[in-house]
Regions:
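Active-site gating loops and adjacent loop-to-helix segments of metal-dependent hydrolytic enzymes
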Residues: 114-145, 152, 187-215, 278-305, ...
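Metal-coordinating catalytic core of metallo-dependent amide/deamination hydrolases
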Residues: 174-312
Length: 507
């Protein structure tokens, strides 16, 4: 692991001549102290991360350099050789740092940031009996503000690619594009007139045979087409658009076929929420005579282009269908645990389902999700000798290459390889909770913090550098979100009593 003569040192530019001269550690430390912060590298320039550690799932290279030229990784190798190859490059001192692939968040609802600190404690679907929904009180551009602060959290915590899965993405698309994140806009549609979703136990008792509307279906498909026409491939290819059916319980066979057809026509992936509650499963059996995966299979929706969100309540037959079809599962480990559920990821993986991960609601910290995924899968496995499978490298793979496969960009992102996009994280390893460490991947996932991330790049451009976000007004966004949140929650409380669970145990 690379070392540094001073903890928490700000990265500074070092000339090629000084590095090649083999300056002593003391001289290097003095130079670093006198150096200033990096300026943002201009588009198309070359940046060399020197004397650093390059981390991939299957290999960790110590004391090497990684060169970024334009938007791609151009070279990885010994620092002196890389600097000789790129004599005009800007040099980012990598001593005491490790480069990780950027994380790929395959399932997010960024606007739900509004309800964090409340939504997490009422089960799923939310059982709180509020007189008014907080989201209905947003005014003007405030919904976009909630999306933006969610994206800000995602950026700070290591995400470089994010799938925003909701309806009406056009309203916040421009703001998301400006964050610098690689985005997949999964425009979500439904065509049921009389099925509220997601299904709840209360909704199930009142449910009736679904009625589907061609008008709703056509409007939703038009939204997908318009979003695709305007945004797919925008911002030098950073933005892609996928179609999405919202929920199994709100989708007709015709909608499912149309979503898949759109994806196949344009060589895209597509997504849906699947088997996320027992109420959903019971609804589908009651009104369609099939469990959710079987319903999707009957209508040709399963397959390797599909990444299904959740799959918490699946039985052996469901798992067999998903595995046989090579459907990808994005399981949102932290939110599942929050709901008191551990999805059967070992069985899904064994059946043939590629696995990815996401954040879902309220929180957008995929780094924390990696750790929860590792620990909850160890519990779910119930191995005779526990605590060995999965390994931290498995959790990292699901959050990087697993996500890249789900969004059909595995040839572009998900690992640090020559020719791939320069989507990467710079981790400061000189931290009390990371040193000493036998394995950097294990140390970070078990003991690390998102704040260990010093800088991040997307498309070869820094979107955060030396812990300063470069693409958004962080302080302004936080202050405005605080103001709006206080107003809205004040209105919620004024509209009627809010039953807060509070402490559930008494002596």
């Amino acid at each position: 692991m690379p070392t540094s003569s001073r903890s928490h040192r700000r990265a500074a530019d070092i000339s090629r001549r000084q590095l090649l001269a083999g300056a002593s550690a003391g001289a290097a430390a003095l130079f670093l102290e006198r150096g200033g912060l990096h300026a943002q590298a201009p588009a198309g320039s070359t940046v060399v991360f020197s004397h650093t550690t390059v981390v991939n799932v299957d290999a960790v290279q110590n004391d090497v350099a990684l060169a970024v030229e334009g938007d791609k990784i151009a070279a990885i190798g010994p620092t002196d050789q890389i600097l000789q190859r790129y004599p005009r490059a800007e040099v980012y001192d990598g001593r005491g740092k490790a480069l990780f692939p950027g994380l790929v968040n395959c399932h997010a609802h960024l606007a739900a940031t509004l309800e964090r600190g409340f939504n997490e404690d009422f089960g799923f679907p939310n059982s709180a009996k509020l007189s008014v929904r907080p989201g209905s009180l947003l005014q003007g551009e405030e919904a976009t503000l909630m999306v933006t602060i969610g994206a800000l959290e995602a950026l700070r915590t290591g995400t470089t690619t994010i799938v925003e899965n909701t309806g009406g993405i056009a309203r916040s698309a421009a703001a998301l594009a400006k964050t610098g994140l690689r985005c997949v806009f999964a425009e979500s549609v439904r065509d049921s007139e009389n099925v509220p979703g997601p299904m709840s136990p209360e909704g199930l008792t009142k449910s009736e045979t679904p009625k589907f509307s061609a008008k709703l279906r056509d409007e939703g498909l038009q939204r997908i087409d318009e979003l695709f026409s305007k945004w797919h491939g925008a911002n030098q290819g950073r933005i892609t658009v996928f179609p999405a059916a919202a929920l199994a319980e709100t989708a007709s066979p015709e909608l499912l076929k149309a979503v898949r057809a759109f994806a196949e026509k344009h060589d895209l992936g597509y997504t849906i929420h699947l088997s996320q509650s027992m109420a959903e499963v019971d609804f589908m059996v009651r009104h369609h005579g099939l469990r959710p995966p079987a319903f999707l299979d009957k209508h040709g929706f399963l397959g390797p282009r599909l990444f299904a969100a959740h799959c918490r309540y699946v039985n052996d037959a469901d798992i067999a269908l998903l595995g046989k079809s090579r459907t990808i599962v994005s399981h949102q480990a932290a939110m599942a645990a929050n709901r008191g559920v551990i999805p059967p990821i070992p069985a899904l993986r064994a059946a043939g389902c590629p696995i990815a991960n996401g954040t879902d609601n309220n929180t957008n910290d995929l780094f924390e999700v990696m750790r929860v995924a590792l620990l909850t899968e160890r519990i779910r496995r119930d191995d005779p000798f526990p605590g060995v499978r999965p390994q931290p490298e498995d959790a990292l793979e699901d959050a990087t290459m697993g996500g890249a496969r789900a969004v059909r960009q595995e040839k572009l992102v998900g690992s640090l390889e020559v020719g791939k996009k320069a989507d990467l994280l710079v981790l400061d390893t000189q931290r009390a909770h990371l040193e000493p460490a036998g394995r950097i991947v294990s140390a970070w996932i078990h003991n690390g913090q998102a704040s260990d991330i010093e800088s991040s790049m997307v498309d070869g451009q820094f979107i955060m550098r030396n812990r300063k976000v470069l693409t958004m007004d962080e302080a302004g966004i936080i202050a405005e979100a605080d103001r709006v949140g206080k107003r809205i929650w004040g209105q919620v409380e004024a509209a009627g009593p809010v039953a807060i669970p509070g402490r559930t145990r008494r002596r």
